């Protein structure tokens, strides 16, 4: 499995916006410049985060984006759903019957499908158990975020 680059970009967008003073917003251009990523791709990502209710969009000359939820209420899985979409990670094509050449057998489900369903369930649980607040706290503990905060202040 591979997460798109949009997932990681989304996490950092959310972490940056969480550091904004209350009632402040930031433009997608400023975020793209800070992360050194494609502005057009980041706009699509941000739209997905807004559509999923993780970000709030404020229109107007001084508009931009801000968090719509607290970091402790946003999990890695919430970001995953916003960026990668809803639905199954693995969808069986039903190839077992073609493989064995008949529809008869002892098992009701394909062993491959069963294993991948269990893997998906574990992944969903794991992603759901990691909040962005945990990530923010760990990042704050391990790194000096002074340069980031100075940059945010300069955006005023």
Swiss-Prot record:
Gene that specifies this protein: yffB
Residue ranges occupied by any HTH rrf2-type domain in the UniProt entry: 2-137
- Gene Ontology molecular function terms on file: DNA binding; DNA-binding transcription factor activity
For this record, the Gene Ontology CC terms, alphabetical, are: cytosol
Query: InterPro entries given for it?
Result: TR_Rrf2-type_CS, Tscrpt_reg_Rrf2, WH-like_DNA-bd_sf, WH_DNA-bd_sf
Spell out the PANTHER family in the cross-references. HTH-TYPE TRANSCRIPTIONAL REGULATOR YWGB-RELATED, WINGED HELIX-TURN-HELIX TRANSCRIPTIONAL REGULATOR, RRF2 FAMILY
Q: What is this protein called?
A: Putative HTH-type transcriptional regulator YffB
Q: Which Pfam families does the entry mention?
A: Rrf2
Q: Which UniProt keywords apply?
A: DNA-binding
